[in-house]
C-alpha cells in the first residue's frame, strides 16, 4: 500500500498503481485535489476503488492520522516543500511499516541537509540523496 501526502493531481499514486501498487491513499489540504485525482484516474484507466482520497492536514489533525492509519504503508511519497517535510517526517514514520520506504522530492538544494537531518531525527535511515540541477530527492527506510 502506498501513501501519497500532498497528492495534488494524484500523479505519483496513479503512476504507482499503473506500475503494480495494489492500493493507494492520498491526502491533501485542498478540496480541489479530489476532482483532479478523479479526472486523472479516469484518463489513466485507474480503478477508483484502488485509490482512497482524504482531505485534511496529516501533520496536525489526529483524525486524519487515524484515518490514514499506522504501520500500514510499504511506501510513502511526498513531493512537497522542505518546510512541510520537516514536521511531516515524524508523522510519516508512524504510517510506514517497519522497513517501509519514504521518498521525498520537491526539495530545493539549499534545504537538502534540513530534510536529511529531519529523516535521521525521526529514526529513519537515509538510503539515497538524488540531485538534479537545483532539485533534491531524499529516500529513506524506516
What are these regions, as identified by a protein language model?
Residues 74-86:
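A short SAM/SAH-binding and catalytic strip from SAM-dependent methyltransferases
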Residues 108-122:
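Short alpha-helix
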Amino acid at each position: 500500500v502506498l501513501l501519497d501526502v500532498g497528492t495534488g493531481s494524484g500523479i505519483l499514486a496513479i503512476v504507482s498503481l499503473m506500475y503494480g501498487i495494489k492500493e493507494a491513499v492520498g491526502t491533501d489540504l485542498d478540496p480541489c485535489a479530489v476532482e483532479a485525482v478523479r479526472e486523472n484516474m479516469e484518463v489513466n484507466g485507474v480503478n477508483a476503488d484502488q485509490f482512497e482520497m482524504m482531505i485534511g492536514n496529516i501533520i496536525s489533525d489526529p483524525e486524519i492520522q487515524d484515518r490514514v492509519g499506522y504501520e500500514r504503508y510499504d511506501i510513502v511519497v511526498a513531493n512537497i516543500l522542505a518546510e512541510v517535510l520537516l514536521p511531516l517526517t515524524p508523522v510519516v514514520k508512524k504510517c510506514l511499516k517497519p522497513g517501509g520506504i519514504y521518498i521525498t522530492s520537491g526539495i530545493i538544494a539549499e534545504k537538502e541537509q534540513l530534510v536529511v537531518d529531519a529523516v535521521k531525527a525521526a529514526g529513519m535511515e537515509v538510503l539515497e540523496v538524488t540531485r538534479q540541477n537545483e532539485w533534491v530527492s531524499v529516500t529513506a527506510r524506516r
